[in-house]
From Swiss-Prot:
Compartment(s) where it occurs, according to its Swiss-Prot or TrEMBL record: Nucleus, Nucleolus; Nucleus, Nucleoplasm
Any one of the GO CC terms: nucleolus
Gene Ontology terms describing biological process: ribosomal large subunit assembly
Residue ranges of the region described as Disordered: 242-264
Family: Belongs to the NOP53 family.
Organism: Arabidopsis thaliana (Mouse-ear cress)
Domain of life: Eukaryota
Classification via InterPro entries: Nop53/GLTSCR2
Keywords recorded for this protein, A-Z: Nucleus, Ribosome biogenesis
Known function: May play a role in ribosome biogenesis.
Name by which UniProt lists this protein: Ribosome biogenesis protein NOP53
Matches recorded under Pfam families: Nop53
Length: 442
């Protein structure tokens, strides 16, 4: 370092200005370093500087003890291995159906025992029934059917019923049969294979052929006249046409008379006629479409002059007064539509209470309709099951005896009902079996 410059030391002010502050700065640095390092070591007590370990020494294991703690190979094989998956059960899984609810056990799964745990040996021939139902935690519950398994028949179906109950059951059986008859009669009629009709005689056929032939000739005559007029105009050497009108003549031949006239007027075909025959043909060609048209072509006027025979169209010019009148009418219509829309909105605001009443009434009707549907569905379930397959359940006919079949004794009873068929229909009605189509054997 360079040599410090000398300063004046006269007076107290000069002495104070040149006093060195290095000692103070060193002290502050030391105190800061001690605070960060945990305190001054020279002032710390001995207990904080040293630690006396008073714990006992662990005994040294001998070689024999270590050898005894080893697990043999045969023992390790018998213990459970957490990395090996369990053998799956051979029981098939139950298929879930619409009417089957599967409830799984919500108990927490037990953690698999570690390798060090001892395996528990169970007696295979013991009578311990503990945990017999705990092996399968899954339980199956089915919705109970509203229809009972064994239904009690009406008293009129008995082998010896009273007169009133027997008549009631006969009326019900007749109603079921008549319902089937009405269903077939009111259904759509089948498509008939043959249609009945009167044969035509030879004279009637002849008159029909003549009418068809005359209608065809009328159409052909009109088309021939139009085409001949166009061919004459095209083949005449004295006719001068514009270059763009050659294609128009081809189009005229394929069009109807009225369309041909319009096409000639639109394209402004310029024709110079030097002969009377050509002039007459042109007039006839232009007047073919005007038959029966009185006031349709008032705005469009066709003039054929003798000098040039030019075909022109005159249109009416729209004046400023007419345009101003149309603008005023348009603005008036627009204003009327706005006023009508405004009046409609005001009427809707005034009728707001009525609208709220209608909405409340509609909600009430919807709720009542939903309630009726639920009740009707429950009533239907009491009679027949829900549809499970392709075919609907068909209730068997009422097993009621006729008057001549009633004997009043079980010994003389006619064997008409079978228990197997009754049980089969009961299973279908309760929704246990899917209804199938009845196969008739001939």
């Amino acid at each position: 370092m360079g040599k410090r410059s000398k300063t004046s030391r006269k007076g107290k002010k000069a002495w104070r200005a040149n006093i060195s502050s290095e000692d103070i700065e060193d002290f502050f640095e030391k105190t800061t370093r001690d605070a960060l390092s945990g305190g001054n070591l020279s002032a710390a007590p001995s207990e904080d500087l040293f630690h006396v370990d008073k714990s006992h020494d662990l005994p040294v294991k001998r070689k024999i003890e270590k050898h005894r703690e080893r697990v043999l190979r045969v023992d390790s094989i018998l213990k459970k291995n957490p990395f090996v998956q369990l053998v799956p059960s051979s029981k098939p899984k139950l298929k879930k159906s619409k009417k089957t609810i599967v409830i799984e056990d919500k108990a927490p799964k037990q953690v698999q025992k570690s390798v060090g745990d001892d395996s528990v040996m169970a007696d295979l021939w013991g009578d311990d029934s503990k945990g017999e139902h705990e092996s399968n935690p899954r339980k199956i519950f089915k919705n109970p059917s509203i229809i009972s398994a064994v239904e009690i028949e009406h008293p009129g179906c008995s082998y010896n019923p009273t007169t009133e109950s027997h008549q009631d059951m006969l009326a019900e059986a007749v109603a079921q049969e008549m319902q089937k008859v009405y269903k077939t009669e009111l259904g759509p009629a089948p498509v008939p294979l043959t249609i009945e009709g009167d044969t035509l005689s030879e004279d009637e056929r002849y008159f029909l052929d003549v009418d068809n032939f005359s209608e065809g000739e009328d159409n052909e005559n009109v088309e021939n006249e139009v085409s001949e007029a166009g061919i004459k105009l095209k083949e005449n050497p004295f006719v001068q046409l514009k270059p763009s009108s050659n294609t128009n003549l081809k189009k005229i031949e394929d069009k109807t008379p009225r369309q041909a006239q319009k096409s000639v007027g639109d394209d402004s075909v310029m024709v110079d006629l030097l002969g009377d025959d050509i002039k007459e043909d042109l007039k006839y060609f232009l007047e073919v479409g005007n038959v029966g048209e009185g006031e349709d072509n008032k705005d469009v006027k066709i003039e054929v002059s003798e000098a040039g025979n030019n075909v022109s169209r005159k249109t009416k010019r729209v004046t400023r007064v007419e345009l101003n009148k149309r603008c005023r009418q348009k603005a008036l219509r627009k204003k009327e539509t706005k006023e009508k829309a405004k009046e409609k909105i005001l009427n809707e605001i005034d009728s707001l209470p009525n609208i709220l009443e209608e909405i409340a009434k509609e909600d009430e009707d919807k709720q009542n309709k939903h309630l009726r549907r639920v009740i009707a569905k429950q009533e239907v379930l009491k009679i027949r099951p829900p549809r499970l397959g392709k075919y609907k359940f068909e209730a068997p006919p009422v097993q009621v005896l006729l008057t001549e079949e009633m004997t009043g004794s079980l010994r003389k009873l006619k064997a008409c009902c079978t228990l197997a068929r009754d049980r089969f229909k009961s299973l279908e009605k309760r929704g246990i079996l899917v209804p199938s189509k009845q196969i008739r054997r001939f």
